[in-house]
Amino acid sequence: MKNILILLWKPLSKHKIEILEIESLKKFYKVNFCEITKIIFPKYKKTTSRLNFKVTKIQNFKALIHFFNKNSFDLILNHTGIQKNTEVYKLLLRQETPILTSYENFISKNLFYPYKFLSLFKNFIFSVIFFFLKKKKLNEYSYLMSDKIENIKNVIGTNIIYGQNYAINEISKIKNKKKIIKNKVVFLDQNWGDNTDYDLYYDRKSINRFKKIFYKELILFLKKFEKEFNAKITVSLHPFSKKKNWIKYKDFNISINKTTSEIASSNLTIGLWSNSLSYAILLKKNILIINSKSFLNMTDEYNYANYVTRYINSSMPLSISESNSLHKDTISKFIIKPNNKYTTYKNFFLQAKNSKSIGLCSAIRNILSKNKTL
């Protein structure tokens, strides 16, 4: 049985295990997990997983060298997001083992004026280089979930596999099989402020101040929404949300690790900025994107909400900072109904143009069987 290493930058949730098709991989290969969080992000606190499989946690670069000296693998799935010019990636190359890196396309300010023109120019230059580059690096593979990835220079010279976002695979399993529940609305929790990712970029004291204000606004808004629309809200919890934090949603139905099916059976999805919005777009659901003035100090979150809204609709997100003044007519104006931009979003972010609907598991099997048809 061939040996696969999945290299991680942070713990995997149960949901992530499913979308990476790891259970399918285990049917064919011995799957190993190595987490290098402390090397990439020394400040990152959460380095444990709730899952019941063994994860080797590497604390420093020397330990990583020792790990590779002791172990050999038939393929390395690079799920870290590290750049190709880093020492870690150079170490991977020295293993003389096929390396498969998956790339997604994330929404950013580079999609809008004036940043868009610089981004397009850079991508054009790298695309020309990519087109004329004849020599391929035999052991480097790039799985593209979109052919418009922002850092196209990372895939130059590698063997390209045009694939699709895991969200498409998930949707294909449930589409047309879920009965829509009348007045059901799903809110996408992102574990804001409690997710340890925030500690990488922001001061914890500032986070705690913002968090207190934001959740007060959020709960008030969700209750207001239920009353105005005679709706029943289900909160789809972030996979790493701790039980002690669930109490803030005690007045609502809660669900965890079932985001796709919850959205499929709902009429409307509410969120700020979440990758899970992709499911709502693919399922052509009504979407309400919210924002809060308390996010002004968390600029990435505040801007992401604006970016998503601008890409699938021309209006801005609904500010929930003054929920008392919000009524059904006002809120309804911000609800985005399925439109042509949903398809544009799918083509831009969720599926490579030349995709053959190859999932990540199939891509790995083809590489290891030396299939040349990719």
Model-derived segments and spans:
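Structural alpha-helical scaffold elements that stabilize or flank donor/cofactor-binding regions
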Residues: 69, 137, 261-262
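Alpha-helix C-terminal capping/helix-to-coil transition sites in glycosyltransferase folds
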Residues: 72, 140, 264-265
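A short helix->loop->beta-strand "cap" motif at the edges of active sites that frequently abuts
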Residues: 94-99, 230-231, 284-286
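Catalytic donor nucleotide-activated moiety binding site of glycosyltransferases and closely related
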Residues: 37-40, 187-188, 211-256, 304-305
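A nucleotide-sugar donor-handling region in carbohydrate enzymes
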Residues: 121-202, 339-340, 352, 357, ...
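Donor nucleotide-activated moiety binding/catalytic core segment of transferases
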Residues: 55-64, 165-168, 234-283, 287
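Catalytic binding pocket for nucleotide-activated donors in carbohydrate/polymer assembly enzymes
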Residues: 246-247, 275-350
